[in-house]
């Protein structure tokens, strides 16, 4: 167990000490006695804004936030310490919403017979872009815009021109400086709660040792690749929060030794969350669900999450489900990260996609139903687990069941920067251990090696013939080892595929053929695992299951499915 966990434990224990470590401030935007004067923040005269409390709170102080919808951007620049963190928490049982949207009233009926309403609109996001979009390309001409409109907390669909409008749409017309809205039920907007997103960030924590707990964040007008919540300080904690319905990413983590615990990242336009340089991130007991609702390009950045240049990040005991893209995506120079005891289900592309990164450990997860989208160019990238030019990985004791493909190796000529340097280095799959997994009932293949390289490295040296080129790799040199896995394919399902479909490619219907020719499997068996009822996600083993299957079962607690040991 890493030493920094003890610091997080101490941080959690501090919460039991009440206000003994510092002052307690109250925020209540609904109170008629609330004020943002310096002498506020008391029970009798609470502060009206969270921002005022964030400005005043110092190490050891506790900010209690009462019920309300807070329309502001909160920036925390002060720092606490390990012994005296700054704490911003919702009051017990309170529903605290921090929103990027403002309410708009005084709607006027627009020209024409349809129930379209208009209001002056002078806000322009991404003014540096010729089309107010990021990325500024034809694919993202609509997707990459930042505007959002909600009626009674339900988002409408955006169109680019007023003549494209229909029920349930809106148009932010920059040239006329008007916002047009058509309710999905043709109602009078002056009788409804109509909100439009005006703020691109909701919370930015620049200080260290800051704990934020129990808040709901929504409706930010954030641009692609930028989180509505930004944790940039060391040892910051986000706990029991929800980030939902952002235009882009729910949150971005960029500080070291941060903790994200029991949070929900759901229905965001591009990503649940992103992380860059978030070394020693602990992401635990969270839900990441149904992100990329706007349809950003999945080959660029979209889906459940994306981690870049992170070292020793841990994703554990969390659910990554129904994301429109990859469930978990490591991309560019990550080192020694861990995914363990997670439930990764129904993501439209890969469950876990590890791309040009080093030393990933994937252990004790349940990975089901991933990869069934028709994403263009996603060859070798729609499996339960994909190692894409990512060496020194260990994949152990996972249930990889019912995906498009089970376990994939994906290879091209790739480079990546390393942490702390911009210099690019070559990177490829080698020294991989895939051991004690149950890989079964995947549709197209249980194992597929997608090697799009010209040197034939995916084949044994003996099958390639003699080569005088010392830089030519062979399968033996890659040191890819499958140890003691359990495989099984049902009727009509593939077993073992090797090579890309547009080049030299071989199918191995049996484990014996796969093992005999490639010589990379040791101790594997091809048997029905004997699940009680996979259709209801009951992955307990029936009485006929053999010992080889039981040895490969995930260790510890995995959320959601029914597993051995009482899950």
Placement of each model-derived feature along the sequence:
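Residue-level signal for alpha-helix termini/capping positions
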Residues: 55-58, 243, 320
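Glycine- and acidic/polar-rich repeat regions and solenoidal domains
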Residues: 201-203, 218-231, 248-255, 266-524, ...
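Bacterial N-terminal signal peptides
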Residues: 7-16
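Detector for repetitive beta-architecture
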Residues: 24, 60-62, 67, 73, ...
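Surface-exposed extracellular loop regions of Gram-negative outer-membrane beta-barrel proteins
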Residues: 230, 237-247
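Positively charged n-region of N-terminal signal peptides that target proteins for export
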Residues: 1-4
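Sec/Tat signal peptide C-region and signal peptidase I cleavage site
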Residues: 18-22
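Extracellular polysaccharide-degrading/modifying enzymes targeting complex plant/algal/animal polysaccharides
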Residues: 24-233, 428, 482, 493-494, ...
């Amino acid at each position: 167990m890493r030493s920094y966990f003890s610091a997080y434990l101490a941080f959690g224990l501090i919460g039991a000490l009440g206000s003994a470590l510092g002052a307690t401030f109250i925020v209540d935007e609904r109170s008629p006695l609330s004020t943002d004067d310096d002498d506020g923040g008391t029970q009798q005269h609470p502060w009206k804004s969270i921002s005022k409390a964030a400005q005043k709170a110092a190490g050891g102080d506790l900010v209690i936030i009462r019920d309300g919808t807070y329309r502001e951007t909160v920036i925390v620049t002060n720092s606490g310490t390990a012994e005296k963190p700054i704490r911003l928490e919702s009051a017990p049982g309170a529903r605290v919403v921090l929103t990027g949207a403002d309410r708009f009233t005084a709607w006027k009926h627009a020209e024409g017979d349809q129930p379209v309403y208009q209001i002056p609109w002078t806000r322009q996001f991404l003014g540096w872009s010729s089309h107010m979009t990021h990325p500024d390309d034809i694919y993202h001409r609509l997707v990459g815009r930042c505007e959002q409109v909600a009626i009674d907390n339900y988002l409408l669909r955006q169109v680019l021109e007023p003549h494209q409008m229909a029920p349930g749409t809106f148009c932010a017309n920059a040239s006329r400086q008007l916002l047009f809205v058509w309710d999905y039920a043709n109602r009078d907007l002056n009788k409804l709660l109509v909100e439009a997103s005006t703020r691109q960030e909701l919370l930015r924590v620049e200080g260290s040792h800051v704990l934020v707990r129990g808040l709901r964040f929504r409706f930010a007008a954030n641009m692609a690749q930028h989180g509505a919540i930004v944790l940039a300080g060391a040892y910051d904690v986000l706990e029991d929060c929800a980030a939902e319905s952002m235009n882009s990413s729910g949150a971005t983590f960029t500080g070291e030794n941060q903790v994200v615990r029991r949070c929900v990242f759901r229905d965001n336009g591009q990503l649940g969350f992103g992380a860059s340089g978030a070394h020693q991130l602990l992401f635990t007991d969270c839900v990441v669900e149904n992100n990329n609702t706007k349809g950003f390009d999945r080959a660029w950045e979209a889906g459940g999450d994306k981690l870049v240049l992170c070292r020793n990040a841990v994703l554990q005991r969390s659910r990554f489900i129904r994301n429109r893209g990859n469930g978990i995506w490591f991309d560019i120079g990550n080192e020694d990260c861990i995914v363990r005891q997670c439930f990764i289900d129904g993501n439209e592309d890969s469950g876990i996609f590890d791309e040009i990164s080093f030393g990933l450990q994937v252990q004790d997860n349940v990975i089901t139903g991933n990869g069934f989208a028709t994403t263009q160019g996603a060859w070798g990238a729609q499996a339960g687990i994909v190692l894409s030019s990512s060496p020194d990985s260990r994949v152990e004791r996972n249930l990889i069941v019912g995906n498009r493909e089970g376990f994939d190796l994906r290879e091209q000529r790739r480079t990546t920067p390393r942490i702390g340097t911009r210099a690019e280095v070559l990177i490829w799959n080698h020294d991989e251990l895939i051991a004690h997994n149950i890989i079964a009932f995947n549709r197209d293949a249980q194992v597929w090696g997608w090697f799009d390289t010209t040197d034939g490295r995916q084949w044994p040296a003996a099958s390639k013939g003699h080569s005088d080129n010392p830089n030519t790799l062979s399968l033996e040199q890659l040191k890819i080892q499958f140890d003691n896995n359990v495989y099984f394919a049902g009727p009509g399902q593939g077993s073992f595929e090797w090579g890309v479909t547009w080049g030299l490619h071989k199918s191995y219907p049996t484990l014996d053929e796969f093992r005999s020719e490639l010589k990379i499997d040791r101790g594997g068996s091809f048997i029905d695992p004997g699940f009680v009822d996979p259709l209801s996600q009951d992955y307990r083993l029936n009485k006929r299951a053999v010992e080889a299957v039981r040895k490969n079962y995930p260790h510890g607690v995995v959320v959601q499915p029914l597993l051995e040991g009482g899950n």
